[in-house]
Amino acid sequence: MNWSFISFLLIFSLFAELGHAQRLDQESTKKTSKSQKSSPPILIIQPKYMRSEVVMMIPDARHTVYSAGYLGELGVNYFKAEEFRQKFSKGWKEFKKKALINATSVIKSVQPEYIKDSTGKIEYALIQSDNPSIVSSVNTQQFRDLFKENFGSDLWVIIPNRSTILVMQAGKNRLNTYKKAFYQMFLDATYPVSREVFLINSKGLWAIGDLKTPSQ
């Protein structure tokens, strides 16, 4: 394993997280207010222990849930239950549809970095973005299309923090190589998302494993 590269990856992820936090702090000082009513909805993916009023379970996930939010003056805000009911009369399905429209436009503007081994074979892809909608883009067709040529139809995805998405072709051996480093990214995160591993394909997204469990 290339430990110097993994150290670089952890530092790079930390700087991206700090940049994300700094951007949110700068937005909070703007004099122009951004109303919740005019802000695009954000499908948040977050640790289960974080509290919010509007939550939806992720299939087979034990530590991660969906939540409903939007971008406000101080960063990502959660919808209160009553606010959510007033804004989305048709419920979660309406909210998710609108949130993914925004996420689709975000993923279209992102170029992944492909990490390769010494022979030039792609190990995994890295996405870094300070846009809070980037994480929910994993639920879009455009996200799957972006990686289909290199990784096929079944994607394994890790989302350690709000600024980072790691994507690889389904395969236990490849994941085991980087499992410890990916889990450390989750532990070091200012805005953690998930310690779980997700399978994404045309059928949807669901959890298939946990980065904390020992490699096999």
Q: Across the structure, where does each feature detected by a protein language model lie?
A:
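Bacterial N-terminal signal peptides that target proteins for export
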Residues: 1-6
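Charged, alpha-helical interface segments at or near domain boundaries
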Residues: 23-132
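Short amphipathic alpha-helix segments
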Residues: 134-148
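Generic recognition of flexible, low-complexity loop/linker segments
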Residues: 145-146, 153-155
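Short beta-strand
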Residues: 156-160
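Short cationic amphipathic helices and targeting signals
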Residues: 163-169
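C-terminal structured domains
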Residues: 169-216
